[in-house]
Structures are given as structure tokens and as C-alpha cells.
């Protein structure tokens, strides 16, 4: 899979992530210039979780994000459809489950909070995934989506686009076990909805009071919403 198939085949995407699993965390830290750690902390803060809460970390990859969430004292489940990614994080002591975001292997209303970081872009039907996340979240529970987005400054957006399409693939060739996967990354980011459009998609999927906060000038956005209480 050398280019971004924007009508993504789930098997291709899972295979691609299996192939980059071994050096995934290192590559992300290098390509983000260390911002990935800040984004994980911001996600944990936005979830507003604490001891006793049950949290689903969807598209958790190697579970590095799940470990950050667990610092709150919450009980965290790391779920991903790439078995290779979960295996690469075997030393991280959180519960791990292989599963498809559009058909989650959990009962209704079981989690106090759900989050997905840099994974919603990779789901073939991300609206279905948003509905599934609502299904497994208890009424009043919270969703936080951490995802690449649209820089707020036109000048910054131009510089960022150049980084994505020119510099990022070159850096990936130096540090990644599968640099072609990062061509997919760049193209999928360019094709992704902006902040307002994603907020609309979340609302249509059943989430209420959807708001977003830009991080790193809008390179990343945190979208948060609640599952409504039954009337």
C-alpha cells in the first residue's frame, strides 16, 4: 500500500500498521518533534477521568496512550485492530483487546469515557465508529477525539503542507521500518475534515455539546462531546 487509499481497505490498513509497529513510537516522537507527549497529556486532561472510571482507548496502537490515561487512576482498555501494534506494546501493563472500531466487542453503556487518538482517519466508515463509541459509552459519558486537523494560520498551513509532503517522507525514510506508510499518513491528513466539519460529524453520530480545542496551532485538534442522558 504505497499511496493513501482514501477508500481504505481495513485489511490493508491493519497490515500497514503491523508493518510499522516495531519503531512506531520512536518514529512518531521524531516526526512530531516531541509534541506527541504533549498531545497525550492534553487528551488525558480533556477526558476528565479519575479513579474508578472505565475508559476505552480506541486505536491505542502500542498502548503508550493508554499508559498516559492510566496515570489518572482510571481503569483503561487499549483496543486496536492491528494485532501487531498491540503485540509491540506487550510490556505495557494495561488490558488489551483486538477489535474493529465499527464493531466493538463490548456491551452497551459500559465505559465512562472513550477516546481515540490519530486513529479515526484510518477507519473506513468513521461515522459508524463514532456511533459505536456512543453505544459503548454510558449516558453522560465523554468522548475525546485527538486527531490531526487544519492549522489556523494560512502561513502556518502552507509551511505545514510542505512539511507533510516533502520533509515528513524523508525523515520517515531515516527512522521508520516502513517509510511508505508515512506517505499514506501525509495524504490522509490532507484529506481529513477540518475542525468544524468533524464537530458536525460527531453531532450527527449522537454526541452532544461538541466542542474543540486546537493544539500546536491547529496541527492537532481535541474534539470533545457527551453522550446524552435518556429523555
Swiss-Prot record:
EC number of the protein: 2.1.1.163
Alphabetical list of SUPFAM superfamilies matching this protein: S-adenosyl-L-methionine-dependent methyltransferases
Signal peptide positions on this chain: none
Presence of keyword Transmembrane: no
Catalysed reaction equations from the record: a 2-demethylmenaquinol + S-adenosyl-L-methionine = a menaquinol + S-adenosyl-L-homocysteine + H(+)
Keywords of the record: Menaquinone biosynthesis, Methyltransferase, S-adenosyl-L-methionine, Transferase
Positions with a binding annotation for S-adenosyl-L-methionine: 62, 80, 100-101, 117
Protein's name according to its UniProt entry: Demethylmenaquinone methyltransferase
Gene name per UniProt: menG
Amino acid at each position: 500500500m504505497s499511496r493513501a487509499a482514501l477508500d481504505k481497505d481495513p485489511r490493508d490498513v491493519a497490515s500497514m500498521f503491523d508493518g510499522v509497529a516495531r519503531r512506531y513510537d520512536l518514529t512518531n516522537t521524531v516526526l512530531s518533534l516531541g509534541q506527541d507527549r504533549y498531545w497525550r497529556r492534553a487528551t488525558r486532561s480533556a477526558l476528565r477521568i479519575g479513579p474508578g472510571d472505565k475508559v476505552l482507548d480506541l486505536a491505542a496502537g502500542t498502548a503508550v496512550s493508554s499508559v498516559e490515561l492510566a496515570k489518572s487512576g482510571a481503569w483503561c482498555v487499549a483496543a486496536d485492530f492491528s494485532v501487531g501494534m498491540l503485540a509491540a506494546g506487550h510490556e505495557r501493563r494495561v488490558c488489551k483487546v483486538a477489535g474493529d472500531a465499527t464493531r466493538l466487542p463490548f456491551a452497551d453503556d459500559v465505559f465512562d469515557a472513550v477516546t481515540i487518538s490519530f486513529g479515526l482517519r484510518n477507519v473506513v466508515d468513521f461515522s459508524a465508529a463514532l456511533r459505536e463509541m456512543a453505544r459503548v459509552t454510558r449516558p453522560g459519558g465523554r468522548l475525546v477525539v485527538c486527531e490531526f486537523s487544519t492549522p489556523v494560520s494560512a502561513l502556518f498551513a502552507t509551511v505545514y503542507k510542505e512539511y507533510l509532503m516533502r520533509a515528513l517522507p524523508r525523515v520517515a525514510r531515516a527512522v521508520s521500518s516502513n517509510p511508505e506508510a508515512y506517505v499514506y499518513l501525509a495524504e490522509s491528513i490532507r484529506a481529513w475534515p477540518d475542525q468544524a466539519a468533524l464537530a458536525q460529524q460527531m453531532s450527527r453520530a449522537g454526541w452532544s455539546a461538541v466542542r474543540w480545542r486546537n493544539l500546536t496551532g491547529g496541527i492537532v485538534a481535541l474534539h470533545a462531546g457527551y453522550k446524552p442522558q435518556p429523555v
